[in-house]
């Protein structure tokens, strides 16, 4: 079985994109989220989709439908380097184990330090062990 994220990361990097996340959904759907500095356009998604369709055919990767999209305004933070890249932005963390009787924390991301997510919540600096973060997303300012 091929490690698809490991196979796609260098391919997408060569095209100028970052693999944010990959998920397999029902009915053979393969959903791929990409990003690049300055954001992703529909033309970027089409170009990546066309490239990957050919790659998957050559490498005999099983899927029925391919969906390529941007991660959206509420982009998930999935890699440790995401926490440094988006320092200063507003984020929402969903915790595995509650802290201060809260399972969700929202505040300004300060970064990642020694496997701990640093953020300011309600004017107070907090440190959350990265292993306790179930999900993290940018919180778009509207």
Curated annotation (Swiss-Prot):
InterPro entries hit by this protein: Ribosome_maturation_RimP (IPR003728), RimP_C (IPR028998), RimP_C_sf (IPR036847), RimP_N (IPR028989), RimP_N_sf (IPR035956)
Keywords: Cytoplasm, Ribosome biogenesis
Record carries keyword Repeat: no
GO cellular-component term (any): cytosol
Protein's UniProt keywords contain Cytoplasm: yes
Pfam families to which the protein is assigned, alphabetical: DUF150_C, RimP_N
GO biological process, one term: ribosomal small subunit assembly
Superkingdom per UniProt: Bacteria
Compartments (UniProt record): Cytoplasm
UniProt xrefs under HAMAP family: RimP
Function (record text): Required for maturation of 30S ribosomal subunits.
Family (UniProt): Belongs to the RimP family.
Protein name: Ribosome maturation factor RimP
Record organism: Thiobacillus denitrificans (strain ATCC 25259 / T1)
Lineage: Bacteria, Pseudomonadati, Pseudomonadota, Betaproteobacteria, Nitrosomonadales
């Amino acid at each position: 079985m091929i490690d698809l994220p490991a196979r796609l990361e260098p391919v997408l990097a060569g095209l100028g994109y970052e693999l944010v996340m990959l998920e397999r959904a029902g009915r053979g759907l393969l959903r791929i989220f990409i990003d690049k500095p300055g954001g992703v356009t529909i033309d970027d998604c089409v170009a990546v989709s066309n490239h990957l369709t050919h790659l998957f055919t050559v490498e005999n990767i099983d899927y029925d439908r391919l969906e390529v999209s941007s991660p959206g305004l509420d982009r998930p933070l999935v890699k440790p380097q995401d926490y440094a890249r988006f320092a200063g932005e507003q984020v929402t963390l969903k915790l595995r184990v509650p802290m201060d009787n809260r399972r969700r924390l929202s505040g300004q991301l300060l970064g990642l330090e020694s496997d701990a997510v640093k953020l300011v919540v309600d004017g107070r600096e907090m440190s959350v062990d990265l292993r306790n973060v179930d999900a993290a997303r940018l919180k778009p300012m509207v």
